[in-house]
Amino acid sequence: MFRPQIQKTRVLVLIAIFNLLMVYFAVNSKVKVYQVGYDHKIEASSIMEKTIKSYKSLIDYEISKNDLFSSGLVGVKTSLITTKEEVEGLDLLSSKIACTHPNFAAAIVEMFYEMDIKESDIIAVSMTGSLPGANIALLSACKAMNVKPVIISSGGSSSWGANRPEYSWPKIESLLYENNIIDYKSVAYAIGGGNDL
């Protein structure tokens, strides 16, 4: 009876041995390639994680169930200092949550590299009370890369940001700075909101 060459046991064994050799070489020849700024990204993420942990030890309010990463940086839907309330079709909460993850600091480091910001550079920064997580991520990236920010911040916040009157962004920033958790503080503050120029 006729058997095609590929079905012969000898050929199948040779193919199996060849495949095993290829798998062995593939597994043992892998090389880890790190992106530019990898060490700064890891450091910034670690700094942000420690900053959030320290901040949580200083606050006296219950962390919202909406705060998926339990950062303590997600505010309330509306308050006396809310500059823009969430309306149907405008999801402000997800953006507030996203920037509270420590990996957001690594994303800021990536942006620094894209903008060719280097160690010892001085940068101008405008912070908003609407995104306290992004503010802390930026400060963490600055610390990791030894970049000095000159900061102007807004005191108000949109829904879910630093909009608790007793924990507005200026108060959070002062609390972190006075407890030596962050190295930089705003040089000026604006009220915030739509008419803030």
Where are these regions (language model features)?
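Ser/Thr/Pro/Gly-rich low-complexity linker/stalk segments immediately outside membranes or between
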Residues: 30-44
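Hydrophobic membrane-insertion alpha-helices, especially the h-region
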Residues: 10-28
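A substrate-binding/cap region within the structured catalytic cores of diverse enzymes
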Residues: 168-197
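N-terminal, Lys/Arg-enriched amphipathic/low-complexity engagement segments
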Residues: 43-101
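Membrane-embedded segments
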Residues: 103, 109-115, 119-167
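Short, Lys/Arg-rich N-terminal segment immediately upstream of the first membrane anchor
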Residues: 1-8
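Electropositive phosphate-/nucleotide-binding environments in soluble metabolic enzymes
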Residues: 11, 98, 102-106
